Every structure is written in structure tokens, then in C-alpha cells.
A protein has these predicted regions:
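Extended soluble regions of mature proteins
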Residues: 12-268
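Sec-dependent signal peptide recognition
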Residues: 1-2
Length: 268
């Protein structure tokens, strides 16, 4: 049995945890000569969508997790790649007492409140520990089933995406590895991760790694954590189906644009 020391905090304590998230992406398709002129642009676009910074604000029972927005370079235009890579995270609200999560997010100009019960995750403690900054962290794991996704944007998407949409979704087992610290006794963490006896400072999930870079306990400026209310309430299952529909539309738009560019090139 693993014994973990728990520090005591007052019930009204607050904190802020800053995280950086990175998704591994297959970029082998960029070696294709047809993409040579746009390689720099595509690399920048991929980085924008796979390397992000987030802020988790928390108290003893509630938390909100949102992206720290970066200034966009003028002329970047519509970020079509956001339809392919990563999670559609707007602002995730988690309430450990009410056992509910709400993702306040936007898609195609419309706001949604993606609402679901907090997952009763069957974490397994390994007994391993390590330090992350000044905090002693302990390892916990669990296995979940997710839809298999191939993060590539070249000929695979252009030629095969339509056929892929007609096939049944392939589910695979993915091991989630988390490192949490009982020094901060809140059952929360980045993204949707929660359910451990301490704040999660690091988590890896297949192609995604999220790492805490800074923690501020009891900041001078207190933030009141509020339950999101902006948008249409929708279940996660229905929202995922809507995402798939819009993603397919974005793919078709991209393919049409490629055909027009190819036709223009032949006429010159």
C-alpha cells in the first residue's frame, strides 16, 4: 500500500498552475516536393496548433482550464488546421463536489457548453516518485480507449479522408501516465484529467504531453471561479458528432481549393 503525505490547506485557498502542451505530429508528408514552397508556412501552422500554453485556476473543489492566447501575426487568416489537431478546448470547468465538467467552447462562430459527468477514473498507483520543480510527485496510470487518429495533412487527407469517414471508427487502448503532488491537495489537473489525491503536474496521453511550468499559490488577486453559462448545452457525444461533420466539410473545402489552384496552374 502506497502511503502519500497530505498537506492541509484552508478551505478558501486558491492557486494558479501554468502548463505547456505539445502534440506529436507526423510531418513526413512535407518531404513531398509539391509542398516545398509552403513548407515554412505549414511548419508554423503545425506549431501554432500543437504547442500551446494553458492556465489552470483552482480552489478546493472547482477549477477552470483555458488556453493562454498568443498574439496572432497579421495575415495569418483562417486557422483551418485547428479542425484536425488537438482537442477543442475552450474553457474547461470542473467541479469535484458536483462531479461535473463543462467545456465552454466555440466552433464555427457558435458557442457550446459541452457538459458531462466527471469520469470515475480507475487510477493505479505505481509507487514511483520524482520531483517536478519543488514538488514531490507520484506516478499514477490508467488505460482508456480512444479513437485512432493519424495527424498528417498531406496526401492521406486529400485522397483518403472521404473514405475514412465512411469506415467504422477504430478504437485503440492508450495508457495515460500522470504525475501528481499531494503537496497541493486538489483533485484536478490539466485538460479533463482529475480524480487523484493531489494536483496533476504532468500527464502524457499517447501523442500529447502536458507539463506544469509554474505554480502560484494564494495569489494576491483572487479569482472567483464561475460555472460557464455562454452557449448551447450539448452532450459530449453529440458535440463530437458535430465536430466530425464540420471537419469533413473543412476537408472538402481544402480539396476544392487544391483543385482550383491546380486548374489555374495548368491554364498559365
Amino acid at each position: 500500500m502506497l502511503l502519500i503525505p497530505i498537506l492541509c490547506f484552508s478551505q478558501d485557498f486558491q492557486g494558479k498552475a501554468y502548463y505547456m502542451s505539445k502534440i506529436s505530429v507526423d510531418k513526413s508528408w512535407m518531404d513531398n516536393p509539391r509542398f516545398a514552397s509552403r513548407k515554412s508556412y505549414m511548419n508554423d501552422m503545425i506549431k501554432r496548433n500543437t504547442e500551446k500554453d494553458y492556465l489552470l485556476e483552482f480552489n478546493s473543489t472547482e477549477s477552470t482550464y483555458k488556453e493562454i492566447e498568443k498574439l496572432e501575426t497579421e495575415g495569418q487568416g483562417f486557422n483551418w488546421m485547428a479542425n484536425y489537431v488537438g482537442e477543442n478546448i475552450g474553457k474547461i470547468y470542473k467541479n469535484a463536489q458536483d462531479k461535473i465538467s463543462i467545456n465552454e467552447t466555440e466552433m464555427m462562430g457558435k458557442f457550446f457548453l459541452v457538459t458531462e459527468d466527471l469520469e470515475n477514473t480507475k487510477w493505479k498507483m505505481s509507487g514511483e516518485s520524482k520531483n517536478i520543480g519543488q514538488y514531490t510527485c507520484y506516478k499514477a496510470t490508467y488505460t482508456k480507449q480512444v479513437e485512432e487518429k493519424v495527424f498528417t495533412f498531406g496526401t492521406w487527407n486529400q485522397n483518403n479522408q472521404t473514405n475514412q469517414n465512411k469506415k467504422p471508427k477504430k478504437m485503440i487502448d492508450v495508457e495515460v501516465v500522470a504525475w501528481f503532488t499531494p503537496d497541493i491537495p486538489v483533485s484536478s489537473g490539466p485538460s479533463w484529467y482529475q480524480g487523484l489525491p493531489g494536483l496533476i503536474l504532468e500527464v502524457s496521453d499517447d501523442k500529447t504531453t502536458i507539463l506544469c511550468t509554474k505554480i502560484v499559490m494564494n495569489p494576491k488577486e483572487k479569482t472567483k471561479i464561475k460555472r460557464p453559462k455562454k452557449g448551447k448545452t450539448i452532450s459530449n457525444q453529440d458535440f463530437v458528432a458535430l465536430q466530425d461533420e464540420k471537419r469533413a466539410e473543412a476537408v472538402e473545402m481544402w480539396r476544392s481549393r487544391q483543385k482550383r489552384q491546380s486548374s489555374t496552374a495548368r491554364l498559365r
